[in-house]
Each structure stands twice: as C-alpha cells, then as structure tokens.
Amino acid sequence: MNRHIVPALALAAACTTVGACSTNQDTEDNPATGVSASPTVDKGPVDPHTTVVDDTAAPQGYSMDSINQMIQDQEAENPGINQDMVSMAQEVTADPAECAALTPTGVTYISKIVQNPDAIAARDFTNESTDATLSVAVSSDPQLLNHPRDVSVCESITRAHAGGSTSYTAAPMELRVDGADSVTAAEVTLTQSSSPLSGDNGSVSRIAYVEIDGATYTVSGSPEVAPEEFTRMVQAQAEKIRQR
C-alpha cells in the first residue's frame, strides 16, 4: 500500500467511537444537551475546504496532513489506488448498520472524499512521539456525515471487514459547543478485535459530530489523545465555521 495512505488510515484508529448527547437547538440555552442558542445569520453555503481547521489548530507536538491532498498525491503516484480504497470501504459493515458512521475507518473518509471532492474536506493531526491522532472532517452535505442521534441503538457495535471483526461498547460524553444546532459526542471502548492494528482491548477513543451554521463536522481522537486536546479541537472547528 502506498506510504501516503498511512496518515489517512490513522482515521481508522481515531474514529472508533460512538455518539451520544444529541439535540436540536431551542430558543434558550440548554446545558443538558451541550447546545447553546445563538442568533441565526445566513452566511451562504459552506466551503469545507476553507472552513476545515488548518495547522494553526494543531496541539503542541502535532503535525497536520491534508487528507484531500494525500488522495490527490497517491492517485498521481499510483493511478487507480483511490478506487481501490472506495471498494475497501464498501466491504466494511457495522451491526447495527446505523452505527457504521460512528466507527468509521480511514478508507471510509477516503471513499467519501473521492466520490464527493467538493463537499468534504478532512485533516489528520498526528503526534509521532505518542502515536496520538486527531482527525477532523467538515462537509457541506449533512448526509456525508450522517450519524445516529440515539446512542442507545449503538451501545454495542461490531464492525466487520476483510481482515476480521472488531467490537466496541459506547457511552455518552458530555460536550458543549456554543451556537451548535446539534452535538453528538461519545467515548467508545474497544472490547475485542481480530486484528492487533485495531488497538488494545480496553482502549478508549472519542468522537463528536456537530451541526453548526450550515455545516456538519466530526472530530475523532485516538486513545492516545488527551481529553482536553480533543475538546479544544472540537471547539476550534466550531469557531472556524462561525467566523467564516
């Protein structure tokens, strides 16, 4: 496999999480939901490529990789490899099926970008000394980052792929994002895997899905990411969208 695929495949480890805490914005702040109300201003369509966070949001010790650029580079070096990634993504399944978006893999995001290059942009932030990875994706099409709003259906998840299967348990994570229309956040624990590449049993990663100001974005953090680094990235992406 092309070496350029490695940063994107970190998304697989970073995105082994399940969402909870979902809500819609009301006319007043609601601390229980993680959403606070703000005036709605029509700023026009969201351009994911200009609103996704850049290297200025990287935590100390982290470097950034553009998944969109990586996809272009690897196709130039190995024509057809991106279509192979799309095919691989189609082989990954989840049970329950609606929870697939809550345990995405690197090829999941590559597939979405290859097929919808203008509608989604993604970045990886990696700390090579700790193997910690934060992954961020922003889309102008909410269907590309569709996710279940009720974590109860995703309490137990099994993800199957050509190399075997991986099982997880999910728990709600409290997360507040000012101005968001919807926040879904959770911690997911790896309980069993047929592949050592999936991580260690008992390892906990985090994921959030946020709908705000006409955009939908997701942030995921591998088990090595500190909780405060994960939260700061979620807030940084919200701020970037609000200020566009």
Question: Where are the regions that the model predicts?
Answer:
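Short, well-ordered beta-strand elements
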Residues: 134-136, 210-223
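Bacterial signal peptide processing site
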Residues: 22-25
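A small/polar (G/S/T-enriched), proline-flanked helix-loop surface module common
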Residues: 64, 68-199, 203, 236
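Short, solvent-exposed coil/turn segments at beta-strand boundaries
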Residues: 57, 179-183, 209-217
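Surface-exposed amphipathic alpha-helical segments
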Residues: 219-244
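N-terminal low-complexity, Pro/Thr/Ser-rich intrinsically disordered segments
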Residues: 30-63
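C-terminal motif of bacterial Sec signal peptides marking the signal peptidase cleavage site
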Residues: 17-20
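Bacterial N-terminal signal peptides that target proteins for export
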Residues: 1-8
